[in-house]
């Protein structure tokens, strides 16, 4: 099997396993897996050491960029568990992990659609974040000569925008970067030239 095909297979395996690990339903069924167990399993799977070992021993791949990519987005139910788990554990100190998850499932089902909406909003924002990070990673993996001046500008400007507007959604952050890029081309030609020359290297 060619090295490129092996890497694609590894990426697909990572995607499948992470999707399976995080497959906690938002519907009426009580999730069966414990959130802390899911988090620990995911952490172990995503670790660079584990990824490198699996890449070498299973696929015979050596080199860089073997990690499974950006942190996956959470479901609405995951955000709910993250928000409520500590309180449930405090109120039920003798309960085992699977019992805590059962209680969380019951609490989730008791919520009205309006009460659940905040968690669905968090999940939607987190999905935007994941897709944005995934696109950034995809572009970073290309050769430097293929990176556009606009992308290089966004890499520098995005952290600044997020710091200035911590509650801004990923979509709006991207829009703000685009706005600043257009303003820079008009108001700061020296800076614009810097990114054009950087992209040309």
UniProtKB/Swiss-Prot annotation:
Residues 70-138, 143-201 bind DNA. GO terms for cellular component: host cell nucleus. Keywords: DNA-binding, Host nucleus, Repeat. The lineage of its organism: Viruses, Varidnaviria, Bamfordvirae, Nucleocytoviricota, Megaviricetes. SUPFAM superfamilies: HMG-box. Its main location: host cell. This is High mobility group protein homolog 068R. The keyword DNA-binding applies. Transmembrane segments: none annotated. InterPro entries: HMG_box_dom (IPR009071), HMG_box_dom_sf (IPR036910), HMGB (IPR050342). Signal peptide: none annotated. It comes from Invertebrate iridescent virus 3. GO terms for molecular function: DNA binding. It is found in: Host nucleus.
